[in-house]
Amino acid sequence: MDHDDFDSVSWRHGPDSDISRPTTSGTDTAESPETRRDPNGKRRMSSASEIPQAGPHADALDLAGIGDGVLECRVDTPIKENDGTKDAYISYLVTTHTDFKSFQKADFTVRRRFTDFVFLYKTLYREYPACAVPPLPDKHKMEYVRGDRFGAEFTTRRAWSLHRFLKRLTLHPVLRRAPLLAIFLESPDWNAHMRLRGSRASTSGSDGGGTGIFDNFTDTFVNAFTKVHKPDRRFIEVREKADKLDEDLTHVEKIVARVARREADLETDYNDLATQFRKLVPLEPEVEVPLQVFAASVEETARGIKNLKDHTDQNYLGSLRDMEAYILSVKSLLKTREQKQLDFEALVDYRNKAVAERDSLAANPSSYYASNPLTSSPASFIRSKMEDMRGVDHEQSRRERMRKLELRIDELTREVESAKTTSEMFDEEVVREVADFERIKAIEFRDSLGALAEQHIEFYQGVLNTWERFVAEMEEEQSTGDAHPNA
């Protein structure tokens, strides 16, 4: 994928704009979405007129609601479709609640498969290169190899990851306004839209995609061996914090994975304990009731441990891995920003070399056609000899070269100004993206840790209730036995 094509970047408003908030705002009133332009003069992406399913009260400026709008999504209930055929797949229920007028209803549901999410991600990644688009969960190739991709554990884990993906989109101040996201959440004709949009993308890519891919690969390859002359301390700190967070999450992930394995071992041990106590019933029939009640209590505790283990493994552990992937998206955006700065600095170097050569020709004309190889540069000596062989007037050749250098300097000056503007605007975009990432990360950590705490509270409350009930039953059994000693 390519982050270097900024002809279609949808630049956001300045730092004082309300659009930097998670809620949408009606600050785009200066011109309609159809006529808005980016810094390069290209038409900005997306317009409300492209949304065929927009509600009857939708406004052209209201792509995702104006003001403090609500957009909440939930992904759950995986179901196997076309079971028993070679085209079987898993679909997920996407439930949306919103007060945006661009939608036809406030509450609606659709079913989407994983490839639909992939299409949504790739399109957003391509159309919003200045955003750190949240990544999708990995394909989990081992599940595909083992044939477990239809298993409940795998599909539940993926449903949680897809839920986090959509929630990150709805919390992003720009991506939540993407027309494609609205279509994805509501449209009953999603497959037709996906085919139509895919054909358009392939057509536009075939028009000039080969050269663009080669140019971008060349730029990336060259920049890989180049260092920024004036690194920005802001982004160095962001990169260092991202690396540290990634490292810490890796350690936490390993610990949580070990905790999940131990919870699975505890579940097995408790189930084995209940089984062994039930085997004592035929051997000790006089204490059958206490043995059965104790075994049932142990089994209930094992079920509680299983629920806790499932949440730890499928939800919380997955949230850590998804956050690691999200951090990689931010790092990729930082790398793209650095490449833009490298492009600007390279253009400045080219212009400075051209200016130095022009000034040298103007200050010392004889250096252009020096005939002594000991006192002139090899290039000047070879050029002078070649012109002598062709009978070229050295002075006229020098003036022609100065004229070309002037034109080249003017062109490079314009390119430098354009690259500087693009680099500075992209810097501001990255600053906003980092702030959005920090906000989304804080919300996600709060929710995931809160859900984990609630699961532990529910588990321990269940354990307390189970064994208090067991003690009460045993006391009742004992009091009954004391009241009827001869029974």
Swiss-Prot record:
Q: Where is the composition biased (Polar residues)?
A: 20-32
Query: What role does this protein play?
Result: Sorting nexin, involved in the separation or division of vacuoles throughout the entire life cycle of the cells. Involved in retrieval of late-Golgi SNAREs from post-Golgi endosomes to the trans-Golgi network, for cytoplasm to vacuole transport (Cvt), and autophagy of large cargos including mitophagy, pexophagy and glycophagy.
Coiled-coil annotation reads 395-430
User: What domain of life does the UniProt record list for this protein's source?
Assistant: Eukaryota
This chain is encoded by the gene named: snx4
Provide the GO MF annotations for this entry: phosphatidylinositol binding
| Compartments it resides in | Cytoplasm, Cytosol; Preautophagosomal structure membrane; Endosome membrane
Q: Under what name is this protein listed?
A: Sorting nexin-4
The protein's matches in CDD domains, at most eight in alphabetical order, are given as: BAR_Atg24p (cd07628), PX_Atg24p (cd06863)
Query: Which biological process, per GO, is one annotated for this protein?
Result: mitophagy
For domains, the record's comment is: The PX domain binds phosphatidylinositol 3-phosphate which is necessary for peripheral membrane localization to the perivacuolar punctate structures.
Residues annotated to bind a 1,2-diacyl-sn-glycero-3-phospho-(1D-myo-inositol-3-phosphate) = 113, 115, 139, 158
Transferase keyword on record: no
UniProt xrefs under Pfam families: PX, Vps5
Membrane topology term reads: Peripheral membrane protein
Enumerate the residue ranges of region (Disordered): 1-59
The UniProt entry's sequence similarity note says: Belongs to the sorting nexin family.
Q: Which PANTHER family match?
A: SORTING NEXIN-4 (PTHR45949:SF2)
What GO terms fall under cellular component here?
cytosol; early endosome; endosome membrane; phagophore assembly site; phagophore assembly site membrane
